Amino acid sequence: MKISIKKKYRFLLALLLLLSILVVIISNFTIEVSARGKTFTDPANTPKNKVGLVLGTSRMLVKGGVNPYYANRIKATIELYKAGKIEFILVSGDNGTIYYNEPTTIKKDLIKGGIPDEKIFLDYAGFRTLDSMVRAKYIFGLDSVTVISQKFHNERAIYLAEKKGLKAIGFNAEGITGKQGVKVQFREYFARVKVFLDLLFNTQPRFYGDKIEIK
């Protein structure tokens, strides 16, 4: 019996869907396993590093109010610094327009939290996590770093960092539950697939630039 074109199409579509799901699962599992034992939630148990790398995000939500992901990263950074587990802070984020400047905004809030101005360095070209990790190594000359973000983000950042020759651990800012948290976690699955595409195609940061010494 001949298989109709419609049935062939459905079979190929189902196969493609299955393969896509497998890619997502494998990508997520690989990154999660790779980061085991490398992220921390208690400053007392967190190894010391010269530099803590804060990954930027928007301060305000689209619908108004402070972004809890942002607020929790600020809190975690201040906590880790005051515990003596980092000496300097590198803030890496998006500075794509004159109206949007993640690093400067974060720096202001860190200073309000008691961190000295001279201890904070800014990376204005951290448009993506990949950019932040590569630039930390090649622009700021770091061999090791403590990444500060939510756990799911730290895991991805650590995987990227190690693939780019940067030793990294993560200090986990508090996560978010509810609808907003679910939405972000869902997007994270696909962000992890993109990690492997970036590594496969050797994607480079948008900008490099002059070297900056953190001291």
Residue locations for each model-derived region?
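Hydrophobic transmembrane signal anchors and adjacent membrane-proximal interface regions, especially
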Residues: 1-9, 78-80, 86
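N-terminal type II signal-anchor transmembrane helix
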Residues: 2-43
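Enrichment for repetitive, rod-forming helical segments
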Residues: 17, 80, 199-201
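A structural signal for short, hydrophobic/glycine-enriched beta-strand patches
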Residues: 29-185
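Extracytoplasmic electrostatic interaction patches
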Residues: 173-174, 192, 209-211
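A transmembrane-helix-recognition feature enriched in membrane-embedded lipid enzymes
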Residues: 182-204
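Short linear elements at protein peripheries
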Residues: 203-215
